């Protein structure tokens, strides 16, 4: 299992402020998923940046668990928060890869 960090600076139009989100996660290469999909995923416990739909955080595929597409999918993720293009509970692929 490989650890990685994703850093994103997001501007919130409603407050005109920037928030820096740092998320540490672990990606796996189980099944058809690659480690890169972990960084793109925003599944269970993922972070939805200021409600703007940026999916950062965990993209796990452990024992058929949570699999997500992160910012590429706009439905509800494993964590139950609205996706809006951020969190997604997809087929395990990352950004169409």
From Swiss-Prot:
Residues 1-20, 78-97 are annotated as: Disordered. One of its GO terms (biological process) is sorocarp development. InterPro entries: HssA/B-like_chaperone, HssA/B-related. It comes from the Eukaryota. PANTHER family: HSSA/B-LIKE PROTEIN 1-RELATED-RELATED, HSSA_B-LIKE PROTEIN 1-RELATED. Belongs to the hssA/B family. This is HssA/B-like protein 48.
């Amino acid at each position: 299992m490989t650890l990685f960090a994703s850093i994103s600076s997001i501007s919130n139009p409603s407050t005109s402020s920037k928030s820096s989100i740092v998320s540490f996660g672990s990606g796996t290469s189980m099944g058809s998923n690659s480690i890169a999909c972990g960084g793109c995923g925003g599944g269970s416990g993922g972070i939805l940046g200021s409600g703007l739909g940026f999916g950062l955080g965990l993209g796990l595929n452990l024992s058929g668990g949570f699999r997500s597409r992160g910012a590429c999918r706009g439905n509800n993720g494993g964590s139950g928060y609205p996706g809006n293009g951020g969190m997604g509970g997809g087929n395990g692929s990352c950004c169409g890869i």
